[in-house]
UniProtKB/Swiss-Prot annotation:
This is DNA primase small subunit PriS. One of its GO terms (molecular function) is DNA-directed RNA polymerase activity. Transmembrane segments: none annotated. GO terms for biological process: DNA replication, synthesis of primer. Heterodimer of a small subunit (PriS) and a large subunit (PriL). The keyword Transcription applies. Belongs to the eukaryotic-type primase small subunit family. It comes from Methanocaldococcus jannaschii (strain ATCC 43067 / DSM 2661 / JAL-1 / JCM 10045 / NBRC 100440) (Methanococcus jannaschii). Optimum pH is 8.06. Its EC number is 2.7.7.-. Keywords: DNA replication, DNA-directed RNA polymerase, Magnesium, Manganese, Metal-binding, Nucleotidyltransferase, Primosome, Transcription, Transferase, Zinc. Its cofactor is Mg(2+); Mn(2+); Zn(2+). Optimum temperature is 60-70 degrees Celsius.
Length: 350
């Protein structure tokens, strides 16, 4: 069996289902969006545009991309090449991209995934929402769109229900977006004048790390530097501050780049075969298990006999089934994952 042809067939099957059931994202203002796609690479081509929803769906059904992206920006000339200056950008969605690396608990290479790094990505998404977006930015849960990225991350879109506020946010300049990113990453944190948001966050972190450290003098004090320098525990406090600043792994380019592309919601991720899945809110996010909930269930009913001859030792668990380099039978879900990670194998039959 031709492996690449079979993979393409599976992607086409999924997109037929997604379009028939109206779950594939139709980006707002579709005629003003740039699209990109890839097969063996993330982006083989971009500067693609569609006049309407029908043209968009027809293209997806015909091409069944393994990686599929839309621009966050709205453009007058989305199909023009030559960078942002050529595209006539007049508006841009605001989204954060959490993209974690492997954790200390992970036993795999950095390009692999497991329950530990997926759990860390989830925890970081919850932390971003509960520690920044709601208390510091004044947003409600209903103002956010939470999307599993299809790999080790989450996309958090800022979508205020108040149209006037949304108009303001989606008109932010690159400098405005950079300020938000720097605030969350603590890059503009000044210990001589700590604002209420970071004060609350750091006090909570200190108490969680070491209950022996008294935070009473810090709770109503802006000038933390002055107080900390006179404490015996100052080195430990400075370490906790740095750890707290580095608690979220955000892809800064998603905020910086005017013409950044983000994966189309309910497309498939070409490295994993997992669904780029939207979640209804924090409750679903807390329950969410990508290794089960981001899998196209029809793929679990397709089983292939394989010969895996890759030298690397690996293991992946999908929908409760474990696969490794000794596996002789794999589901279509596992097939897409192994193919996306360049594991060497041949299909014998299905």
């Amino acid at each position: 069996m031709n492996t690449f042809a079979e993979v393409q067939k599976l992607y086409r099957e999924y997109y037929n289902f997604a379009i028939k059931n109206n779950i594939l994202e139709i980006p707002e203002g579709i005629e003003y969006r740039e699209f990109g796609y890839g097969y063996l690479k993330k982006v083989d081509n971009r500067n693609l545009s569609f006049k309407n929803e029908r043209e968009y769906k027809d293209w997806v059904l015909k091409n069944a991309p393994m990686h599929f992206y839309k621009s966050l920006a709205y453009m007058l000339y989305p199909n023009k090449s030559g960078g942002a200056s050529k595209k006539g950008i007049f508006r841009r969605e605001l989204a954060f991209d959490i993209d974690v690396h492997k954790t200390k608990k992970c036993k795999h290479e950095d390009d692999w995934i497991c329950k530990h790094c997926l759990e860390e990505a989830k925890n970081q998404a919850i932390y971003l929402i509960e520690e920044f977006l709601i208390p510091d930015f004044g947003l409600n849960e209903e103002d956010l769109k939470i999307v599993f990225s299809g790999n080790r991350g989450y996309h958090i879109y800022i979508k205020p229900r108040d149209e006037k506020i949304r108009d303001i946010i989606e008109s932010y300049s690159k400098e405005d977006r950079r300020f938000l990113m720097d605030y969350i990453l603590g890059k503009n944190l000044n210990l001589n004048s700590v604002g209420s948001g970071w004060r609350r966050r750091l006090i909570k972190a200190i108490k969680e790390r070491d209950k022996r450290i008294s935070t009473k003098k810090l709770e109503n004090e802006k000038n933390w530097k002055k107080v900390i320098e006179n404490l015996k525990s100052k080195n430990k406090i400075y370490n906790i501050i740095e750890e707290t600043k580095n608690k979220i792994e955000l892809d800064e380019k998603v905020m910086d780049d005017d013409i950044r592309l983000l994966r189309v919601i309910n497309s498939l991720h070409g490295y994993t075969g997992f669904i780029v899945k939207p979640l209804s809110g924090l409750d679903e996010l807390r329950r969410f298990n990508p290794l089960e909930d981001a899998i196209f269930k029809d793929f679990e009913n397709k089983v292939y006999e394989v010969n895996i001859f890759d030298d690397r030792k690996f293991e992946i668990e999908i929908c409760g089934k474990k696969y490794n380099n000794k596996s002789k039978k794999i589901t279509a879900s596992a097939l897409l994952y192994l193919f996306g990670h360049n594991i060497k194998f041949e299909l014998l039959k299905s």
